[in-house]
């Protein structure tokens, strides 16, 4: 179970990308930054810099399923972006269901009294942390059960 993981969690939105990372043990996800989107080239440059700085070996991207559990137009856009990024950076890609992660992020920030309705970037960063933490928890339980890979 001691497989090292250096994952980067992404909450991809139209205006911003929340980013989270994890410690080498794969136990704890932490919000890192929020990328304000401008162009694909600039987005990828910022993600690439984080990947290199943190020796990332995997991308975990939140997939915004509809409340009915289907892949809608927003999820398709996120998949297209995530596949391009993963391919360009030569990294494996995993998806996590991100339904309600922004609501949960906002609630967590309010509970910690770190919330301002104007700080959407902090919400995106917290949502990325939630997405990555859920993936890490799922991975850990899967490894404890004797599996090696999660479903992609």
Swiss-Prot record:
SUPFAM superfamilies: Ribonuclease H-like (SSF53098). GO terms for biological process: rRNA 5'-end processing. Its main location: cytoplasm. Keywords: Cytoplasm, Hydrolase, Nuclease, Ribosome biogenesis. InterPro entries: RNaseH-like_sf (IPR012337), YqgF (IPR005227), YqgF/RNaseH-like_dom (IPR006641), YqgF/RNaseH-like_dom_sf (IPR037027). It is an enzyme of class 3 (hydrolase). GO terms for molecular function: nuclease activity. The keyword Hydrolase applies. Its EC number is 3.1.-.-. It is found in: Cytoplasm. One of its GO terms (cellular component) is cytoplasm. Belongs to the YqgF nuclease family. NCBIfam families: RNAse_H_YqgF. Could be a nuclease involved in processing of the 5'-end of pre-16S rRNA. This is Putative pre-16S rRNA nuclease. The lineage of its organism: Bacteria, Bacillati, Cyanobacteriota, Cyanophyceae, Synechococcales.
């Amino acid at each position: 179970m001691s497989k090292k993981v250096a994952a980067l969690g992404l909450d991809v939105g139209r205006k911003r990308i929340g980013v989270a990372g994890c410690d080498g043990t794969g136990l704890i996800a932490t919000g890192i930054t929020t990328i304000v989107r401008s162009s694909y080239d600039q987005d990828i440059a910022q993600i690439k810099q984080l990947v290199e700085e943190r020796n990332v070996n995997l991308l975990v991207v939140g997939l915004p399923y509809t409340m009915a559990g289907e892949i809608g137009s927003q999820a398709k856009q996120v998949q297209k972006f995530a596949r391009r990024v993963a391919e360009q950076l030569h990294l494996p890609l995993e998806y996590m269901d991100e339904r309600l992660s922004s609501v949960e992020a906002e609630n967590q920030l309010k509970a910690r009294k770190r919330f301002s309705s104007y700080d959407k970037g902090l919400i995106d960063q917290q949502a990325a942390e939630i997405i990555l933490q859920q993936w890490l928890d799922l991975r850990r339980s899967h490894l404890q059960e004797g599996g090696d890979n999660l479903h992609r």
